[in-house]
């Protein structure tokens, strides 16, 4: 079942609550919709230096990756575990979910290119650059001036690039199992 996409600027009401531009794009499991903040795409280019149509495609595919996790029951399982553990473990599980969504975005790019030959020269680099731009370390460094790895909820730039690339190169769901990986 495909998710519905909701485009917004500024703020939006979802089944998960009210969200402003500071949240950026997100997936709401309660209504199974992907919410895409159009202001974020300008920020991706202007603040993080990640531009191009494939940078935007990566972000959308990442959020749809969360919908895939919902369809597979992964989001629900992780949410149950997170309700029973402390913040450090919650954050670690969140990073695993986010990196898996990055991998699923790479898997989508692999399959789309294989079936439709859609990638142009430079597209993969745009996606990798976007993955790097939204790493917790880069965001923390730019907003706080320092990095606190224990506070990561999405993964470092290097991790996000690695998992997006892995999904793209392998192109299989099995390759995206961050929960059993030796190295995130």
Regions from the PLM with identified roles:
Residues 9, 38-40, 72-73:
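A mature extracytoplasmic/lumenal domain signature
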Residues 1, 89-92, 96-139:
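Short helix/loop segments within enzyme catalytic domains
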Residues 36, 55-71, 102, 106:
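Active-site recognition of the HExxH zinc-binding catalytic motif
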Residues 132-184:
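Pan-zinc metallopeptidase signature
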């Amino acid at each position: 079942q495909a998710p519905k996409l909701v485009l917004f600027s500024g703020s939006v009401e979802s089944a998960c609550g009210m969200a402003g531009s500071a949240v950026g794009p997100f997936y709401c499991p309660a209504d199974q919709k992907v919410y895409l903040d159009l202001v974020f795409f300008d920020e991706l280019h202007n603040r993080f230096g990640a531009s191009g149509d494939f940078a935007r495609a990566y972000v959308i595919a990442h959020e749809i990756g969360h919908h895939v996790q919902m369809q597979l029951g992964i989001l629900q399982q992780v949410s149950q575990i997170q309700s029973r553990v402390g913040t450090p473990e919650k954050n670690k599980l969140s990073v695993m979910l986010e990196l898996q969504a990055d991998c699923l975005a790479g898997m989508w790019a692999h399959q789309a290119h294989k079936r439709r030959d859609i990638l142009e020269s430079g597209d993969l680099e745009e996606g990798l650059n976007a993955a790097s731009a939204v790493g917790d370390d880069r965001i923390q460094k730019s907003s706080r001036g320092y990095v606190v790895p224990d506070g990561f909820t999405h993964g470092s730039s290097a991790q996000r690039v690695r998992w997006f690339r892995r999904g793209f190169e392998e192109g299989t769901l099995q390759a995206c199992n961050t929960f059993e990986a030796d190295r995130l």
